[in-house]
Amino acid sequence: MKEPSKNRIVAMIPARYKASRFPGKLMKDLNGKTVIARTYEAAVNTELFDEVYVVTDSNKIFDEIVNEGGQVIRSKKEHECGSDRIAEAVENMDVDIVVNVQGDEPFIDKNSLAKLLKVFEQEGAEEIDLTSLKTPLKDSDDITNPNNVKVITGKDDFALYFSRFPIPYRRDTSANVTYYKHIGIYAFRKSALMDFYRLPMLHLEAAEKIECIRYLEYGKKIKMVETSVKSVGIDTPEDLEKARKLLS
C-alpha cells in the first residue's frame, strides 16, 4: 500500500508496439511473462503510486494488460514520444504528480523512484516541475553506446543537455570526468506535463530522438537525481538475453 502523501501520484507506462530499434520488444517473452507485463507488475509492486496504467495504441499490448488484470488506457492519437502519449491519458485525471515509466524497464528500483518523488516534498519543491534519474557510467562501451543517453548537469544538478554522444567531450584527456547515463524515468507535475504536450518538437529533440530535450529547448529546468542502481532497459535482442539471465 502506498504511504500517505499530500500529492496524488500515478505511474503511466507508455507502450508502443512498433519500436524502431526492436519492434515488438514489449511483447517478447521474459522468463514466462512479457516485457510489458513485467514492467507493469514491477511498478505496482513498488507501492509508491495511487494508480498504475499502461497507455498504448496497440491492441496486442492492450489485451495483454487486460488479461494480466492490469489497468490500461488506449491512446486516441499518434504521438511522437511517450510523454505526449501519457499527457493525452492524464489530461482529465485528478492527479498531482505523473511518473513516466518506460515500458522496456522491467527492473524498476523502488529506492531510486522514492528519491525521485521525494524532490517534490523538499524545501523549494514549488520551483521544480520535472525530475529524472542519472547513474554513473564507467565502461567505455557503455559510454559510447548511442542507446545509452548521456546527461550533463550543473552544480545544482539541473540538466544542461542530453545526448547519445559521449558528453562532455574530453579535449584534455587527463581531465577527471564522470559520465552519466540518463535513466528514462520522469516525474512531472501534471501542469508541467501538459505544458510539455502543447509545445511543438524542435530540431534538437528531432535530431537526438530524446524527448526531454524539448523541455530544455524551451528554457525549462529538469532536476536530476543520482542513483547508483544500474538501469536494465531492453533496447536490443542482446539486452533481452541479459534480462533473461538476470531472472534465471
From Swiss-Prot:
Coiled coil region boundaries: none
Q: Write out the catalysed reaction.
A: 3-deoxy-alpha-D-manno-oct-2-ulosonate + CTP = CMP-3-deoxy-beta-D-manno-octulosonate + diphosphate
Q: Name one GO biological process term.
A: lipopolysaccharide biosynthetic process
The organism's superkingdom is given as Bacteria
Gene Ontology cellular component terms for the protein in this record: cytosol
* Chief localization: cytoplasm
Question: Could you say which enzyme class this protein belongs to?
Answer: transferase
Q: What is its EC number?
A: 2.7.7.38
One Gene Ontology term of the molecular function aspect:
3-deoxy-manno-octulosonate cytidylyltransferase activity
- Assigned keywords, A-Z: Cytoplasm, Lipopolysaccharide biosynthesis, Nucleotidyltransferase, Transferase
- Identify the pathway: Nucleotide-sugar biosynthesis; CMP-3-deoxy-D-manno-octulosonate biosynthesis; CMP-3-deoxy-D-manno-octulosonate from 3-deoxy-D-manno-octulosonate and CTP: step 1/1; Bacterial outer membrane biogenesis; lipopolysaccharide biosynthesis
Entry's localization field? Cytoplasm
Q: What does this protein do?
A: Activates KDO (a required 8-carbon sugar) for incorporation into bacterial lipopolysaccharide in Gram-negative bacteria.
Instruction: Read off the HAMAP family from this record.
Output: KdsB
For this protein, the record's PANTHER family field holds: 3-DEOXY-MANNO-OCTULOSONATE CYTIDYLYLTRANSFERASE (PTHR42866), 3-DEOXY-MANNO-OCTULOSONATE CYTIDYLYLTRANSFERASE, MITOCHONDRIAL (PTHR42866:SF2)
Family recorded in the similarity comment? Belongs to the KdsB family.
- Which protein are we looking at? 3-deoxy-manno-octulosonate cytidylyltransferase
